[in-house]
Amino acid sequence: MPEFHGRLVVLGATGFVGSHVVDRASQAGWQVVPLSSRDVDLGSPSSSLALAAILEDGDTLVHAAAVVPSRNAADVCRNLLISQALVDAVAGVAVAQLVVVSSDAVYGSDSGVVTEKSSCSPDSLHGAMSLAREMVCADVSTPVLTLVRPAAIYGNGDTHNSYGPNRFARQVLESGEITVFGAGEATRDHVTVADVADVIVRAIQTREAGILNVASGQSVSFADLAALVRDVGPAGARVVVAGSESSPTFRTYDISGLNRRFPDLVPTGPAVGIEQMVVAMHGSANA
């Protein structure tokens, strides 16, 4: 793997993905400049000037600053303002690479196999925001623009509590009871936050341009995910059914593109990743 030179500036450095990128890059001995909203509030009118004063020619920039998930128009607008502030800030800076941490929500939620060549057809505000955010960032003049589109991310430290591994793990540790909608038939690919950070660091080392879908390559039903969490949870944990699962969809990822770029990458499977997360969450709760 080629050696990285220069500074890595991470926006959203205290967020779920951003903090893991900072940790992973720091472990590799890189010069990391972590920036959170406390350092530069990209939603404020003068933020582009503040960020421009920090940036230097040759910097590599990871854009992980966002309000996620975007649940309303205000969230969408704020995210686009944040990205526009970034674009304005780098107008006079020779950025070596811009990595935009986006989402697989840009593809919508229909059943099927997803690849980097799949068409973008978002069917949620979060998906529409993610795609618009990518388009705003495309205005940055850089020799390497990398769009990272992870599948649903899970891991210790997640704050979103979305339906799936993160919520199931919290439920099993708090009450010993995991709630699944209907039969839990819908299938999704879930990827660990550590794997997402690893791919981002790899993409910087090799200056990968274009779209990178990040997934485990293993799609699992929500019922099976709940069972995996139950089995590594406290004794007596159980799965209960609530309501119904309307129009379940079945999504899989072809990660051959990811494998071609990083032949030695071994994604973390759900059985291993979920056990690691539950153990880490239990340890954090008892710390």
Model-based region annotation:
Residues 85-125:
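Conserved Rossmann-fold NAD(P)-dependent oxidoreductase catalytic core, especially the SDR/UDP-sugar
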Residues 32-50:
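Adenosine-cofactor binding site in Rossmann-like domains, unifying the SAM/SAH pocket
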Residues 4-26:
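N-terminal Rossmann NAD(P)H-binding glycine-rich loop of SDR-like oxidoreductase domains
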Residues 176, 181-184, 188-287:
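C-terminal substrate-binding subdomain of Rossmann-fold SDR/epimerase-dehydratase oxidoreductases
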Residues 45-81:
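NAD(P)H-binding glycine-rich loop region in Rossmannoid oxidoreductase-like domains
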Residues 11, 35, 61-65, 98-104, ...:
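SDR active-site strand-loop-helix element
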Residues 121-146:
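Active-site Tyr-X1-5-Lys
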Residues 107-108, 124, 148-163:
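Flexible, glycine-rich beta-alpha linker
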